[in-house]
């Protein structure tokens, strides 16, 4: 299996979710199943079937997170010397040349991506267009809305 790049923050978020699922959610579901069993006939017991379905989702998510963490390559960008190039984990300040609007993005792993928080996936069109570029470079990126031209104003490793 290939390594999944992930920031330290992303790995911590997954570990917290895993801890919640294993130590809080799993026991809640087990209790709900036990309680539903006490109501008698399991064939027509909607509470029992709903709890079993929740258990399946919970166990599936636990396995998914454990797999991602086992195959993750956790990258601490603060320990990488800043040579001004856009790399995984870098925070980039961009100027949209058409609108004169400044936007800031951090390139993160797929699971961490949240465009509203300025976190873009390393596999997104914007990130793929920026990787390897430097401050003052102008890049044209093909987005779902058409071509967008950005100037790289700043690259930080934080």
UniProtKB/Swiss-Prot annotation:
Listed A to Z, the keywords are: DNA-binding, Transcription, Transcription regulation
Pfam families hit by this protein: GreA_GreB, GreA_GreB_N
GO MF terms here are:
DNA binding; RNA polymerase binding
Q: Can the keyword Signal be found in this entry's annotation?
A: no
Disulfide connectivity for this sequence is none
GO terms, biological process: DNA-templated transcription elongation; regulation of DNA-templated transcription elongation
Family classification = Belongs to the GreA/GreB family.
Which PANTHER family does the UniProt record give? TRANSCRIPTION ELONGATION FACTOR GREA
Q: Which HAMAP family match?
A: GreA_GreB (MF_00105)
Q: In its UniProt entry, what is this protein called?
A: Transcription elongation factor GreA
Which organism encodes this protein?
Answer: Pasteurella multocida (strain Pm70)
Q: What is the lineage of its organism?
A: Bacteria, Pseudomonadati, Pseudomonadota, Gammaproteobacteria, Pasteurellales
């Amino acid at each position: 299996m290939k390594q999944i790049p992930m920031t330290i923050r992303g790995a911590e978020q997954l570990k917290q979710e895993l801890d919640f699922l294993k130590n809080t959610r799993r026991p809640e579901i087990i209790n709900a199943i036990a309680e539903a069993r006490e109501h008698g006939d399991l064939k027509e017991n909607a509470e029992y079937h709903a709890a079993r379905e929740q258990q399946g989702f919970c166990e599936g998510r636990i396995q998914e997170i454990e797999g991602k963490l086992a195959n993750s390559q956790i990258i601490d960008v603060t320990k990488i010397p800043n040579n001004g190039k856009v790399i995984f984990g870098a925070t980039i300040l961009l100027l949209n040349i058409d609108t004169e609007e400044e936007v800031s993005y951090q390139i993160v792993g797929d699971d961490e991506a949240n465009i509203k928080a300025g976190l873009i996936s390393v596999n997104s069109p914007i990130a793929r267009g920026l990787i390897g570029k430097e401050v003052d470079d102008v890049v044209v990126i093909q987005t779902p809305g058409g071509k967008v031209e950005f100037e790289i104003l700043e690259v930080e490793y934080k």
